[in-house]
Swiss-Prot record:
Keywords: Cell membrane, Cleavage on pair of basic residues, Disulfide bond, Extracellular matrix, Fertilization, Glycoprotein, Membrane, Pyrrolidone carboxylic acid, Secreted, Signal, Transmembrane, Transmembrane helix. The gene is ZP1. Residues 607-627 are cytoplasmic. This is Zona pellucida sperm-binding protein 1. Residues 537-556, 561-580 are annotated as: Disordered. Expressed in oocytes (at protein level). Residues 1-20 form the signal peptide. It comes from Oryctolagus cuniculus. Disulfide bonds join C219-C244, C228-C243, C238-C253, C440-C461. Proteolytically cleaved before the transmembrane segment to yield the secreted ectodomain incorporated in the zona pellucida. O-glycosylated. Residues 21-585 are extracellular. Belongs to the ZP domain family. ZPB subfamily. The keyword Glycoprotein applies.
């Protein structure tokens, strides 16, 4: 026994001599105890701070610039620094500022020990080289070998995992999380170490994931059951979503006494934390919040038993990175400690808590999307007087699908044959503008004020003095982009008469219209009805009271000429409108009278001839008898 103690004492002395060979920090400044290890995917630096100190990490780039380290999925940096626990910095070999030199990964980290007032107590630079050149630990003032092997994942704090807590996908769920179990017994007084949830990639077609569910003790929710979001109400779908199922309850599928995360393809994830889990980890449920958006993204729902977060994948501090054909979305849920201040000190009974949430999606999947495109509002129109560009054209038929060109004029029409006229507003895209026709008329020349004239529309309505009234056509809403910019009407072909001789003027007819653009304002509208009151109100805009302004008048590209089917010019016996006369019956009457007169004349002539011949014969006979 004495020999064994002597051997142990000699070993301790040898170890002390070995430690004495290492460099010491400057006098009066405590050294930093740190170590690092190399894993399969990254490197990990562990620093043991003195009580009351916090550790801050900074990475150094190849030019010597220092950058403070935070949890960053883009740079593959993770930091964990909890009270009375080692400060851990993890970096992936593909992370930011990791340099490749001769087959080794080099990362320079600047370590600072911070006092409670924010000042730096001591700072030290550490160079991490993986794979390590040897198995010697980097040393500060004391050599502290690792007590446990480092995990290969970048999350270094101690945590407990159970494969039974993993649940497969619910509605649109791509991957699920390994949830933390209740913390084990504390090794000493004070707050317990932080518990960090580990994220595992869970393939959809993994056979042992189907049917996995929460332990029965986690489903003993006393009150305030929160319905779980699932695609169907079946037990299998509920359990695969990581929720509890009880057919005897009013809400058969509900969240259990744990932390449940559901990632949805439509752009958000749901995080539910139970009161029982908060008690197990010695935290206050009301103090749980998102780490990067504590005020902007509060819980969507709070009850006495649960806190529910509805987090968009693109907001609330959620980070995203692309690795191969996968998208990684990450966020963190933390809990602030509840501090009680007394007259001579402050205490807390809360532990620290940090839950890393990660949703993994396949970037190569084809998913349906629904997009709503909202056109920007049109600018407010400016109403003022100005020139209008109008066009009057004649259609080939009643469909108004094609129109005559300038080279087609003059057009030839039979009397009473319809002429299809369209007036439209050019170079205007304001849908609220309304084209209004005031007066439309016809003249025998290209001069709009030449006499004679015949009205087609009076105050926008068909002229009532015509037995063949102009027909104003309604426009189909679907056939024109700006329906209110068009006006159409149909005219029966006619010809002008010589007022003196009452004979048809064999000439051309030109069409004209006066128009304006109306813009509604306030309760007033631009719609008009063809009534006597409207005609009186708008009478002043017609050409009867004067010559209309040139900018308001539009004419047809060319004239329209009429053609009589019998190629003869009728002479009319009756007075009235040339359009009320029909030359065909009058012609037959004249011809009939001429025929009768001719027959009578011939009969009279023949009778008289025979009478004179009889008298001559009687005269000759009497003469012969006298001789």
């Amino acid at each position: 026994m004495t020999g064994g103690r002597l051997v142990a004492l000699l070993l301790l002395v040898a170890a002390s001599l070995g430690l004495g060979q290492q460099p010491h920090p400057e006098p009066g400044l405590p050294g930093l105890q740190y170590s690092y290890d190399c894993g399969m995917r990254g490197m990990q630096l562990v620093v043991l701070p003195r009580p009351g100190r916090t550790i801050r990490f900074k990475v150094v780039d190849e030019f010597g610039n220092r950058f403070e380290v935070n949890n960053c999925s883009i740079c593959f940096h993770w930091v964990s620094a909890e009270p009375q626990a080692p400060a851990v910095f993890s970096a992936d070999y593909k992370g930011c500022h990791v340099l490749e030199k001769e087959g080794h990964s080099h990362l320079t980290v600047f370590i600072e020990a911070m006092l409670p007032d924010g000042h730096v107590e001591v700072a030290q630079e550490a160079v991490l080289i993986c794979p390590k050149p040897g198995h010697t630990w980097a040393v500060g003032s004391h050599q502290v070998p690792p007590t446990t092997p480092s995990p290969t994942t970048p999350h270094a704090l101690p945590f407990h995992l159970s494969s039974a807590h993993t649940f497969p996908i619910p509605l649109y769920l791509e991957h699920s999380l390994m949830l933390p179990t209740p913390a084990g017994p504390s090794l000493g007084p004070g707050p317990t170490p932080a518990v960090l949830a580990q994220v595992e990639r869970w393939e959809v077609d993994k056979p042992d994931a189907v049917g996995s569910h929460l332990p029965q003790e986690w489903c003993q929710v006393a009150s305030g059951h929160i319905p779980c979001i699932v695609q169907s109400s079946s037990k299998e779908a509920c359990e695969q979503a990581g929720c509890c199922y009880d057919s005897a309850r009013e809400v058969p599928c509900y969240y259990g006494n744990t932390a449940t995360v559901q990632c949805f393809r439509n752009g958000y994830f749901i995080l539910v934390v139970a009161q029982e889990m908060a008690l197990a980890h010695r935290i206050t449920l009301a103090n749980v919040h998102l780490a990067y958006a504590p005020t902007r993204c509060p819980p969507a729902q709070k009850t006495s038993a649960f806190v529910i977060f509805h987090v968009p994948l693109t907001h609330c501090g959620t980070t995203v990175q692309v690795l191969g054909s996968q998208l990684f979305y990450e966020n963190q849920l933390v809990s602030d400690i509840d501090v009680r201040e007394g007259p001579q000190g402050s205490i807390t009974r809360d532990s620290s808590f940090r839950l890393l949430v990660r949703c993994i999606f396949n970037a190569s999947d084809f998913l349906p999307i629904q997009a709503s495109i909202f056109s920007p509002p049109l600018p407010a129109p400016v109403t003022q007087a100005g020139p209008l560009r109008l066009e009057l054209r004649i259609a080939r038929d009643e469909t108004f699908s094609s129109f005559y060109e300038e080279e087609d004029y003059p057009l030839v029409r039979l009397l009473r044959e319809p002429v299809h006229v369209e007036v439209r507003l050019l170079q205007r895209t304001d849908p609220s503008l309304v084209l209004e026709l005031h007066q439309c008329w016809a003249t025998p020349s290209a001069n709009p004020v030449q006499q004679p004239q015949w009205p087609l529309l009076s105050d926008g309505c068909p002229f009532k003095g015509d037995s063949y009234r102009t027909r104003v056509l309604a426009l189909d809403r679907a056939e024109l982009p700006f329906r209110s910019h068009y006006q159409r009407f149909t005219v029966a072909t006619f010809t002008f008469l010589d007022s003196g001789a009452q004979r048809a003027l064999r000439g051309l007819v030109y069409f004209f219209c006066s128009a304006s653009a109306c813009h509604p304002s306030g309760p007033e509208t631009c719609s008009s009805t063809c009534s006597s009151r409207t005609a009186k109100r708008r009478r002043s805009s017609g050409y009867h009271d004067g010559t209309p302004r040139a900018l308001d008048i539009v004419s047809s590209p060319g004239p329209v000429g009429f053609q009589d089917s019998h190629r003869q010019e009728p002479t009319l016996e009756s007075t009235g409108s040339g359009r009320n006369s029909n030359p065909k019956p009058l012609l037959w009457v004249v011809l009939l009278l001429l025929a009768i007169a001719l027959v009578l004349g011939i009969g009279v002539f023949v009778g008289l001839s025979q009478a004179w011949a009889h008298k001559l014969r009687e005269g000759h006979r009497l003469t012969d008898q006298a001789q």
